[in-house]
From Swiss-Prot:
Name of the protein: Cell division protein CrgA
Major subcellular location class: membrane
Gene Ontology annotations of biological process type: cell division
Lineage, uppermost ranks: Bacteria, Bacillati, Actinomycetota, Actinomycetes, Micrococcales
One GO CC term on file: plasma membrane
Places the protein is found: Cell membrane
Annotated coiled-coil segments of the chain: none
Function comment: Involved in cell division.
Gene: crgA
Keyword annotations of the record: Cell cycle, Cell division, Cell membrane, Membrane, Transmembrane, Transmembrane helix
HAMAP family: CrgA (MF_00631)
Length: 69
């Protein structure tokens, strides 16, 4: 018996890990900027909600990680 492999259809596109790691990195940088600048960056108008925004961006990257093959 021969098995058919469809590796190209099962693997993620090349851009997938780039976006995934980019989201996690962006969220981490967002949080570091918030703490280093004492809330003056990246969005001073939203205050401590910047932490939730950063976690949301990081979690989007982790959600993509669950689909990575």
């Amino acid at each position: 018996m021969s098995r058919k492999k469809h590796e190209s259809s099962e693997n993620n596109p090349v851009w997938f890990p780039t976006i995934m790691f980019g989201l996690m990195g962006t969220g981490a940088v967002w949080m570091v900027l918030f703490y280093i600048s004492n809330g003056a960056l990246p969005l001073p108008a939203v205050g401590t909600w910047n932490i939730l925004i950063a976690f949301g961006i990081i979690m989007a990257g982790f959600a993509m990680m669950s689909r990575w093959k």
